[in-house]
Amino acid sequence: MRFTENFERAKKEALISLEIALRRGEVDEDIIPLLKKINEKPNYFTTSSCSGRISIMEMPDFGDKVNAKWLGKWHREVSLDEVLEAIRKHREGQLWLLVRSPILHVGARTLEDGIKLLNLGVSCGFKYSNIKSISDRKLIVEIRSTERLDALLGENGEILVSDDYMRKLVEIANAQVRRFKRKLKRFEERIEEL
C-alpha cells in the first residue's frame, strides 16, 4: 500500500510540525511524554493530540464551533470558582459546559502496525478508538475514549442553572478527567508493547 511507501516522509513532516507546536506552547503539557514515546517508535508518529479537557464555551448555536468562544478551558480538574468565573463572562448565544476525552491521531507504517496500536488503545480503555483514515499518503489511527459531557448552562446572558447544580456538574466533570487521565497513564505505560 502506498501509505507504507510514504511513511518516512509523513513522519518527518509530522515531527517538524510537532516541534513547531511545542516551541509555541500549543501542545498539552501532560501528554508530551506520551507523544515522545510514540514518536520514538520506528513504526508510528503522532499527527495531533489533546489530553482531554473541561471547557466553558459560548456559541451562537450548539455545534457552531466556527463562531464559538472559549470562556474557560482546562486540561485538568477544575474548581467550582474557576468555572463560575468563566461563566460570568457569558454575554450572548448559548453557554455550555463541555468535557471531552483525550484524542490522539497516530500514523502507522503498516495496517498490521495500525491494528496493534488500535488493540492496545482499546485494551487501555479507549473504547472509541478506530482507524480514522487510510489514503495513499498515510494510515491514521484515532485513540479516543468515551468520556463526554455537554450541559447547557445559559442563554443570551442569562444563567439557567443553580450554583448547587454547577457544583454537581463540576464534580462529574472532574471525575471524568480523573478517569481519562488514568487511561492515558496506562496507555503511556504500555506503549512499549508496540
Curated annotation (Swiss-Prot):
It catalyses: 4-demethyl-7-[(3S)-3-amino-3-carboxypropyl]wyosine(37) in tRNA(Phe) + S-adenosyl-L-methionine = 7-[(3S)-3-amino-3-carboxypropyl]wyosine(37) in tRNA(Phe) + S-adenosyl-L-homocysteine + H(+). One of its GO terms (biological process) is tRNA methylation. Keywords: Methyltransferase, S-adenosyl-L-methionine, Transferase, tRNA processing. S-adenosyl-L-methionine-dependent methyltransferase that acts as a component of the wyosine derivatives biosynthesis pathway. It holds the Pfam family TYW3. This is tRNA(Phe) 7-((3-amino-3-carboxypropyl)-4-demethylwyosine(37)-N(4))-methyltransferase 1. Its EC number is 2.1.1.282. Belongs to the TYW3 family. It is an enzyme of class 2 (transferase). One of its GO terms (molecular function) is tRNA methyltransferase activity. It comes from Pyrococcus abyssi (strain GE5 / Orsay). HAMAP family: TYW3_archaea. The gene is taw3-1.
